[in-house]
Amino acid sequence: MKNNYTSLKSPIDEGDESKTGHEIDLEKGLLPEYDSEEEGALPPYSDHARVSNSPNTHRENNPSRSTDNSSPFLIKLLISFTPIYVLNVLAICYLKYKDAFFKNYGAAEWTLFGFWCLVCTLALIFLTYFYETWTKAVKVTAVGLYNSRKKWVVIIWLLWVVICFVLFGCIKFGNLNLDKALICSTCSISAALLLFLLYVRLPFWTLKHMFSGLFQVLGVQSCVVIVTKGLMYLFDKHIDATGYEIEATSLFVIGNFFFFYEMECPGALKRMPKFIRNGIASFLEGIGNAIGRIGNAFRGANDNNNNIPLEETEAESEV
C-alpha cells in the first residue's frame, strides 16, 4: 500500500529554503525583518550573531586574569601580612608576660628565633602567592557561618568549651585556691554572656530560650553539688584537690551537654524527670519480669517432678 504524501510547501518556499539552507524554528518564530543596509546588521538567528552576542566571553570565563578585579600587589602583601602580625603580637605578649622577651638568650633561643622568622617569611610568601584562594575560602566560610546562625551557636559554644578547659589547666598549675565546681557555673554564665554579646541580632524568643536553658542547667548543677556535699558531710569526709577537679570536670561536661541538648531540643530538660521516671519504671518492670520468669521456671520444674507416674517410682524403688 503506497503512502499518498503531498508536500504542503510550495515551489517558491522550497526554492527559498534551498538558497538559505535554514528552516523556520517553531520555538523562535518567524525571522524578524531587518535592514541589511545598516552596518553590522545581521539576522538574529545567524551563526555569526550567536558568536558575537555570546554572553560568556574569554575575559568573563577567566576572571583571575582580568586586571580590573585583581588587587594590587601591595594590598595583597598587606592583607597577607595581617594574620602573621596578629600571631606575632600574641607571641610577644606571652613573652612579655613571662618576662622572657630577649632576655638571657643562648644559642638554642636564637636558633629558635631564626626558625620562627623563617616560618613567618615562608607563610607570608605562601599567603601572598595563593591570595585569591585563601581569601575566597575565608569569604565563603564567613558567609556560610553568617547565614547559618545555628552553626554559629554550635561553633562558638565548642570554642568556649576549649577556652574553659584551658582556664582549668591554668588554674590547676597555678596558685589559685578556688573551688573547681564553682568555676563550672562561672564558665557557663560567661559563655551565655558571650553568646548574648555575639547574638544581639537574634530574636527575643531565642535569647529567652537560651537563658531558660542556662538556668535549668545551673539548677541541675546545683542539685548535684548539694547532693555531693551532703554525702561527704554525712560520711564525715572531705574532698581533696583531685576530688574537686573530678567534680568540676563532671559538672562542666554535664552542664555543657544539657545546655547543648536544650538548645537543640527545646523543653528537653522539663521532660527529663518524666523520662527518668519512665526509665526507672521500665527498669524495675524488667527486673520484676525476670524474677517472675525465674519463678515460673522453678514452678514448672516442680510440676514436672510431681507429674511422674506412680509405677515408675515403684519400679525405681524395687531396683
Swiss-Prot record:
Compartments in which it is found: Spore membrane; Vacuole membrane
Main localization category: membrane
Any one GO biological process: meiotic drive
Classification via Pfam families: WTF
Transmembrane residue ranges: 73-93, 110-130, 153-173, 187-207, 215-235, 241-261
GO cellular component: cytoplasm; fungal-type vacuole; vacuolar membrane
Membrane topology: Multi-pass membrane protein
Region annotated Disordered, chain positions: 1-22, 35-68
Translocase recorded as keyword: no
Record's keyword annotation contains Electron transport: no
InterPro entries: WTF (IPR004982)
Keywords: Membrane, Transmembrane, Transmembrane helix, Vacuole
Entry's family note: Belongs to the WTF family.
Protein purpose: Acts as a suppressor component of the dual wtf meiotic drive system, and can suppress but not confer meiotic drive by compatible poisons. Wtf meiotic drive systems promote unequal transmission of alleles from the parental zygote to progeny spores by encoding a poison and an antidote from the same locus; the poison is trans-acting and forms toxic aggregates in all spores within an ascus, wherease the antidote is spore-specific and targets aggregates for degradation by the vacuole.
Quaternary context: Homomer. Interacts with other proteins that exhibit high sequence similarity.
Protein name: Meiotic drive suppressor wtf16
Gene for this chain: wtf16
